Amino acid sequence: MIIDADYITEDGKPIIRIFKKEKGEFKVEYDRTFRPYIYALLKDDSAIDEVKKITAERHGKIVRITEVEKVQKKFLGRPIEVWKLYLEHPQDVPAIREKIREHPAVVDIFEYDIPFAKRYLIDKGLTPMEGNEELTFLAVDIETLYHEGEEFGKGPIIMISYADEEGAKVITWKSIDLPYVEVVSSEREMIKRLVKVIREKDPDVIITYNGDNFDFPYLLKRAEKLGIKLPLGRDNSEPKMQRMGDSLAVEIKGRIHFDLFPVIRRTINLPTYTLEAVYEAIFGKSKEKVYAHEIAEAWETGKGLERVAKYSMEDAKVTFELGKEFFPMEAQLARLVGQPVWDVSRSSTGNLVEWFLLRKAYERNELAPNKPDEREYERRLRESYEGGYVKEPEKGLWEGIVSLDFRSLYPSIIITHNVSPDTLNRENCKEYDVAPQVGHRFCKDFPGFIPSLLGNLLEERQKIKKRMKESKDPVEKKLLDYRQRAIKILANSYYGYYGYAKARWYCKECAESVTAWGRQYIDLVRRELESSGFKVLYIDTDGLYATIPGAKPNEIKEKALKFVEYINSKLPGLLELEYEGFYARGFFVTKKKYALIDEEGKIVTRGLEIVRRDWSEIAKETQAKVLEAILKHGNVDEAVKIVKEVTEKLSKYEIPPEKLVIYEQITRPLSEYKAIGPHVAVAKRLAAKGVKVKPGMVIGYIVLRGDGPISKRAIAIEEFDPKKHKYDAEYYIENQVLPAVERILRAFGYRKEDLRYQKTKQVGLGAWLKF
């Protein structure tokens, strides 16, 4: 099983290293024969001798083309002859490529920006994470004394925790009498002990939570200050930091550094991404949070160190559990796109699609288009096109609602209509599909590059799902599920990739044709559905909600199932409408904002959720009760009464302060904030008192009654004293409770001012319930 690949240099020559796990043992394979190359398209082949003479300089050394070879390729499906230009070292490519491109005889150069080790994996057909080797995992976490505003890495690391299958341990340099704590003499010895632990346990995968931007950069900084090395790599190298967009990424040679933070940010949508919040969202278990100022106080006074050690141990344990949960999916994505987990886990879906396409292009002898330069990128960003069809919803409270949607609408359109850059407006074509409204033509004489790959992916997914049904082995079933989910992620990203401004296979015409066909098919379903006696309540891109006013639930379900069968007989190719479900009751506020309840009593909302941390508990609680009154009891009047009661209690200061706390996260050093919001103002006041505030810290505050801006009246929850302080009732009514429910009750004719306890407006349910 290939874990990773890179290259080293010996005597000026590159040597590919393949890090592998084989029969339970780690090994490294070397290849000294692979050479870097780029492609050049010439105006006239006779100019190749001139091109061969092009030289450049790199670190005082002359860079030259070592060999040339004429090759037959395809470019967007059309035959093309290009020259393959070999160089001595991968770093020669950036040194010489612009000189080659600028030569008068050169039309353009291609595939000059594919990293050498990744090029090797593609060309040799090697796939990381293939095989059944059992990998070993170790989670690592650190606790520091880091003061906001001070130099990064100035404060010491006070604890390092680690966890694996054997359990979790903490290393520290102050005496703590706990069975899982190991005490050493100094911070220096603690870091050296971590190195020893990693070398002894020799994990294949090191799991962290934000290790790219905090744990490892901090460890490296402290090791440097203390004059010690951090040889964590299997080749005894130190962790290597590199820029990746706005963030850092840390690589450990011979091991997979699996940072959960970017993976979880890409995979799930949460109001906050603290380790505690993620753990609760995934496993439904709570974990105590110990704040930075509490850690500092415990370390300085010696009181409460056991609590900090337990917190540190749990950090490592939770990171390990989360790592084991998320790693298999990233491993399957790595197998699918053919690049290492380290890269895949830090990639956007657009980049995952691109690596997959680069590999498949090589297999099919296709020359990959170049990435856009800055000017072309800016031009693409300015381009726009019409998206999916969204129908304004029918207002009111509805009963007996069916949900119908297309199975993989956009991938199905791409395959059915052969939507691809190489089929677009193709000359000498016998059969075309013409996109409605936009008029772009796609050749049907041959399968397009991207539609054929997408078709293979969807076919493979169906086979995997079939095997899952047949399999009786739970382990195999789980692995197959990870595989089919990885395919789904990739398949659903192709439409977005066509419109991704940085894409090699960017195709605005393809993207707008896909949405045009999407609008046509959903409109066809709408018209046919209305002809069948249904009332369409809401449409959004690939799905819709409908009912038959006055009909019984079973009749609505039965007719909907018959309709699905009928419409699918009329739809072309892979297009297929599915019966998604039945809802007892629901209402639609505006586009992408609605709430439904199924027959089991489960409430489903979209666009109405106030899950962000900057909503107080009282706002969330009131909204939940309002939804329950409307959907479970069918009683809008009851919902209004609930809001009035809450606003009355707020006005009379009868709501406990813990329900008024607003949480916001500090996302950057305090000195970098230009706009001072309430959470920043509170954080600055805490920092002035010696509390260690750092990026990632969540600030909880309550807004007090008084004059002046909110930022001056916000107080940290820890400092709020009910005997001394009064919360600002008007702020919580106008900026928390009413906005949370107004968007719902507006659908039933209520305005914000109608919902306060001192103002009333009687509107009965009968005016809104449809029969």
Swiss-Prot record:
Biological process (GO), any one: DNA-templated DNA replication
Mutation effect (residue 277 to T): In strain: ST 855
UniProt effect for mutating residue 320 to S: In strain: ST 855
E.C. no: 2.7.7.7
Reactions catalysed according to its record: DNA(n) + a 2'-deoxyribonucleoside 5'-triphosphate = DNA(n+1) + diphosphate
GO molecular function, a single term: DNA binding
Keywords of this entry: DNA replication, DNA-binding, DNA-directed DNA polymerase, Nucleotidyltransferase, Transferase
SUPFAM superfamilies: DNA/RNA polymerases, Ribonuclease H-like
Gene3D superfamilies with a match to the protein in the record: DNA polymerase family B, C-terminal domain, DNA Polymerase, chain B, domain 1, Helix hairpin bin, Palm domain of DNA polymerase, Ribonuclease H-like superfamily/Ribonuclease H
Phenotype when changing residue 263 to A: In strain: ST 855
UniProt record similarity statement: Belongs to the DNA polymerase type-B family.
Name of the protein described by the UniProt record: DNA polymerase 1
UniProt organism field: Pyrococcus abyssi
Highest classification ranks of the organism: Archaea, Methanobacteriati, Methanobacteriota, Thermococci, Thermococcales
